[in-house]
Swiss-Prot record:
A motif ('KMSKS' region) lies at residues 668-672. Belongs to the class-I aminoacyl-tRNA synthetase family. This is Isoleucine--tRNA ligase, mitochondrial. The lineage of its organism: Eukaryota, Fungi, Dikarya, Ascomycota, Saccharomycotina. NCBIfam families: ileS. The keyword Protein biosynthesis applies. InterPro entries: aa-tRNA-synth_I_CS (IPR001412), aa-tRNA-synth_Ia (IPR002300), Anticodon_Ile_BEm (IPR033708), Ile-tRNA-ligase (IPR002301), Ile-tRNA_ligase (IPR050081), M/V/L/I-tRNA-synth_anticd-bd (IPR013155), Rossmann-like_a/b/a_fold (IPR014729), tRNAsynth_Ia_anticodon-bd (IPR009080). It comes from the Eukaryota. Gene3D superfamilies: 1.10.730.20, HUPs, Ile-tRNA synthetase CP2 domain-like, Valyl/Leucyl/Isoleucyl-tRNA synthetase, editing domain.
Length: 1002
């Protein structure tokens, strides 16, 4: 016969007291029970929980959006619906190269938290992840196994094919890792900057900018990467504050006629040679010198040094290291006297007089007030050159070597590469500077040289110093565009607010954007060069439109096919007679132009998917990227948008920036330092790094708990704290689930039918919901978790959970008090679901897997889908809450003080062994049983206060009501079931427990 689950009452009399105490009634208690595991299972997380909480939810809600949208008729209705119900956070595309690092996880998870919060607020989410697919790093990686000779001979089409495969592989790997982060999106339909539609959109943006007169080709100085062999934009530079150069003070002699003219202007007689003393930190550019600039507002001095005269700005004399007796000031004069003078550059010995020119850029901070000017190697120099008709001369090739055939014969021998006599020396080689300075010294033109530590631009890809070199490049004119851009961002919100200053300062300093690159893996600039005159370029709106249409038909690779020499196909019919004279340009666009055109993805969504003829403005609500993107993607998307539309409206409504990831020593994580931590190491754990396995939610918790607007720290110590915090949350969910399994009635009671302590607890839950919602709206995710942890520790663990256990475990399963507690627990569970779903979607999804279905069926307050459930609001009776704070909580506080006394005096260690008597002359708004539950005593009596209780502490409860409290050891026996000292006889059940057991037996 099968043994009965319950032990008959008469059997207890023959069982030992010890066994009775520990085991006899255990099966009659409603002990917590759930299959919700103590730890997450990564295999189940990846296979089941992430798809269910992420991709499936995203697709479902987007289908619902389209269904609702399809019911609307007018454009105004549709735009209003989009404004009210659609939330778009546009994904700045990560680069399709290499493995993902913690910074990628930081970026994607922050975006996901925002999207999931918006989903909880009843919004529909459109979030399309993207990848930035073109550019030099991918091209270099694709060609890394080839020799330099092979690379020189390989065709652009082959390079593109190899780069494409590399990008595709990188995207596949990165996508697989991104999917482990539980991101709310559809990974099957990302946007790629190498997609055909994307490329056509980008070419059309270029065409619109060209039609507005913003695109121009000029031979002017640009930053040039000698390692990567391409022009660079300002955004592709990083500055080394400790770069060391060899700087020099160099003398340039005035021509004889200019010497005479100056002496005449100054009213002096002189037979000594006069030299202009310049200072430079780039001696290699002296071969390209075309002028010396001065500032006509400065005071200059003519100094006698031994048997020669030196011209310098008066305030610079102290920098020359001269002793008082070593020089004589012949004359001080205004800079205007230098107008019209000429000097010679004896280093190149070309007998050509070079002018002294006024330049407002000349300052007295460094140097001598006389500035060596090489229009082919500097921005200010270039402007002076254009204004004065100087040659834009740059005898340096794409490898950063002197071009010997471009140099005068007199200097070719000294800058010839000794290892290869057909080539010039590398201009940045320290030995090159020494050779030039040695030559200057031989010519008696070197005053002195010294090592100079200063800030210098480096190529952010190769980490090598760049040069400034004049080459024919395509530029976007930003003089007017930046004013539109600045006007537009004055209406953009920034988080943190300092982002506005950073972005606007970068914008103000830009007058142009070099958009051409000399690489094969990119979007082509659709221009044509005359074969016989490479500087003669053919481009207009008609040609651009024709070429774009041809690319639509043949694909973009056709442009790079060097076997396709039929130019008639690429040019409109009216150019067919001369088409054979032209060839297609091989220049490609800056990759920042690529990613900066990504707002067209959102534009396509409106126009192609939603069939809208009128678009929302701005196009999307939020973009979120690292703080380095103020000079990158935030700027390029802003520029392309306002430049192509000619309207001062940014594509985004709000810009959010995050910091970088640091190790526990505060060092920025980098491969070169060897202190990086991969997201997978955090998810799976890494013994070598001392990292515990935190799972997907642990990675997300780590990111959410940080103040992401500054740099975030990650390492073993931080991970340990995250693991402990995550465990607390998980155990809280486990407690809730385990006490919701047993119930005869899964219907929630109305809040007004709950006990006062339950209503107070739900009021605190509502406060928590409101506070955390405010934090979410301000992107203070760390404060969300801090607030929740405080509530968990102080309101739940230390109070409500503690006082509810006796009712949950010992009361009849169908008792009103137990139903009241369970109703409260369901509301707590649902509130924690709402608060944590944006941060810990996997855990929340897992919780819902184990919640009894009865609590989910037909309930107004709780949704069957935890990711799409509403943000709860619990309507509290504030009068009851205030009364509870004034009555029960004040009594509880005094009880705790009195119990400490009882414990010290009589050794009572458990409140369940105490008896409480409340004396009062007033009616109290609670029952003795309710107060007993809160105090967790064995029993509470409420008696009439008399004058004999003066020795008892009096508690002022407000409104003239006061009570006295007596706490003493209970005179009754411990109940062997609930352990309260409330039984009339030893080893006998208390009345409450006897009724519960009898109910089970019936």
């Amino acid at each position: 016969m099968k043994r009965s689950r319950l032990v008959p009452q008469h059997i207890f009399s023959i069982i030992s007291k010890r066994y009775l105490a520990k085991h006899a009634y255990q099966k009659t208690l409603n002990l917590p029970k759930t299959k919700f595991p103590n730890r997450s299972n990564l295999e189940i997380t990846l296979r089941e929980l992430i798809p269910k909480s992420s991709q499936l939810v995203y697709k479902e809600q987007l289908r619902d959006f389209f269904e609702e949208f399809s019911k609307l008729n007018t454009t105004d209705e549709k735009l209003e619906f989009i404004k009210e119900k659609l939330f778009i956070l546009h994904d700045g595309p990560p680069y399709a190269n290499g493995e993902l690092h913690l910074g990628h996880a930081l970026n994607k998870i922050l975006k996901d938290i925002i999207n999931r919060y918006q989903l909880s607020q009843g919004k529909y989410i459109f979030y399309k992840p993207g990848w930035d697919c073109h550019g030099l790093p991918i091209e270099i990686k694709a060609l890394k196994d080839l020799s330099a000779q092979q690379i020189e001979s390989i065709s652009p089409l082959k390079i593109r094919s190899m780069a494409l495969k590399h990008a595709q592989k990188a995207i596949k790997r990165q996508r697989e890792t991104f999917q482990h982060f539980a991101i709310l999106t559809d990974w099957e339909t990302p946007y790629l900057t190498m997609d055909k539609d994307y490329e056509i959109n980008q070419l059309n943006i270029f065409k619109e900018m060209y039609e507005r007169g913003l695109i121009k080709r000029q031979n002017k100085p640009v930053y040039w990467g000698t390692e990567t062999r391409t022009a660079l934009a300002e955004g592709e530079l990083e500055y080394n504050e400790n770069h060391k150069s060899i700087a020099a003070y160099v003398k340039f002699p005035l021509e004889k006629k200019s010497q005479m003219d100056l002496c005449k202007k100054l009213g002096i007689t002189n037979n000594l040679p006069i030299y202009c003393l310049i200072w430079t930190s780039t001696p290699w550019t002296l071969l390209s010198n075309r002028a010396i600039c001065f500032n006509q507002d400065f005071s200059y001095s003519l100094l006698r040094l031994n048997s020669e005269l030196i011209l310098v700005e008066t305030g610079s004399i102290d920098k020359l290291g001269l002793t008082t007796n070593s020089f004589e000031t012949i004359k001080q004069f205004q800079g205007t006297h230098l107008n019209g003078l000429y000097y010679q550059n004896l280093l190149v010995d070309d007998k050509v007089g070079r002018p002294l020119l006024h330049g407002a850029h000349v300052t007295s901070g460094t140097g001598t007030g006389l500035v060596h000017t090489a229009p082919g190697h500097g921005q200010d120099d270039y402007l002076i050159g254009i204004q004065n008709g100087l040659e834009i001369y740059s005898p340096v090739d794409h490898q950063g070597r002197y071009q010997l055939n471009e140099l005068p014969q007199s200097v070719r021998s000294i800058v010839r590469d000794e290892g290869d006599l057909t080539k010039g020396r590398q201009v940045l080689d320290a030995e090159t500077a020494k050779i030039i300075l040695c030559k200057l010294s031989d010519l008696n033109l070197l005053y002195k040289s010294h090592e100079y530590t200063h800030s210098y631009p480096y190529d952010w890809r190769s980490k090598k110093p760049v040069i400034i070199r004049a080459t024919p490049q395509w530029f976007a004119d930003l003089h007017d565009v930046k004013n539109l851009a600045l006007e537009s961002i004055s209406r953009v919100k920034f988080c943190p607010k300092r982002g506005y200053s950073r972005l606007s300062s970068f914008m103000k300093s830009r007058n142009e954007w070099c958009i051409s690159r000399q690489r094969s893996w990119g979007i082509p600039i659709l221009s044509f060069y005359k074969k016989s005159e490479p500087d003669s370029v053919l481009m207009n709106s008609e040609i651009l439109a024709h070429a774009i249409e041809k690319i639509k038909q043949k694909g973009i690779n056709a442009w790079f096919n060097d076997k396709d020499n039929d130019m008639k196909e690429w040019l409109p019919e009216k150019y067919h007679d001369v088409a054979h004279e032209y060839c297609r340009s091989q220049d490609t666009m800056d990759v920042w132009f690529d990613s900066g055109s990504s707002w067209s993805v959102i534009k396509d969504f409106y126009e192609k998917s939603l069939k809208l003829s009128k678009l929302p403005s701005p196009l999307y609500q939020v973009c979120l990227e690292g703080s380095d993107q103020h000079r990158g993607w935030f700027q390029s998307s802003l520029l392309t948008k306002v430049a192509s539309s000619n309207v001062p409206v940014a594509p985004y409504e709000e810009v959010i920036t995050h910091g970088f990831t640091l190790d526990e020593n505060g060092l920025k994580m980098s491969k070169s330092v060897g202190n990086t931590i991969s997201p997978e190491a955090i998810i799976r754990g890494d013994e070598n790094l001392g990292l515990p396995a935190l799972g997907v939610d642990g990675l997300r918790y780590l990111i959410a708990q940080s103040n992401f607007t500054t740099d975030i720290v990650a390492g073993p110590t931080v991970m340990k704290h995250v693991g402990e915090a995550l465990k607390k949350v998980r155990l809280t969910f486990r407690y809730l689930l385990s006490n919701l399994q047993k119930s005869q009635d899964f219907n929630l009671l109305p809040i007004e039918q709950l006990r006062r302590v339950d209503q107070y607890t739900l009021y605190k839950i509502n406060e928590l919901l409101e506070t955390t919602r405010e934090h979410y709206q301000k992107y203070n995710f760390s404060k969300v978790l801090i607030t929740l942890q405080y509530h968990l520790n102080n309101e739940l663990s230390a109070f409500y959970f503690d006082i509810s256990k006796d009712i949950l475990y010992s009361n009849q399963i169908s008792s009103l008090a137990r139903r009241q507690v369970q109703t409260t627990l369901v509301h707590i569970l649902n509130a924690y679901r709402a608060i944590l779903a944006p941060i810990l979607p996997v855990m929340v999804q897992e919780v819902w897997k184990y919640i009894p279905e009865g609590w989910l069926q037909g309930q107004e307050h709780i949704d069957i889908n935890p990711m799409r459930g509403k943000w709860p609001f619990l309507d509290s009776n504030t009068e009851i809450v205030t009364s509870f704070e004034n009555f029960e909580l004040k009594i509880l506080k005094q009880f705790q003080e009195e119990f400490k006394r009882l414990s010290l005096e009589e050794g009572v260690t458990k409140t369940t062994h105490s008896h409480v008597t409340i004396f009062t002359k007033h009616h109290l708004p609670f029952s003795s049983d309710e107060l007993c539950d809160i105090l967790q005593s064995s029993a509470v009596d409420i008696l009439q206060m008399d004058d004999n209780n003066n020795s008892l502490p009096t508690i002022e409860l407000g409104s003239g009501i006061n009570v006295q409290i007596l706490v003493e050891r209970s005179k009754r026996h411990n109940c062997p079931r609930c352990w309260k000292a409330n039984s009339a006889e030893e080893d006998k059940l208390c009345d409450r427990c006897k009724e519960a057991v009898d109910h089970l037996m019936s």
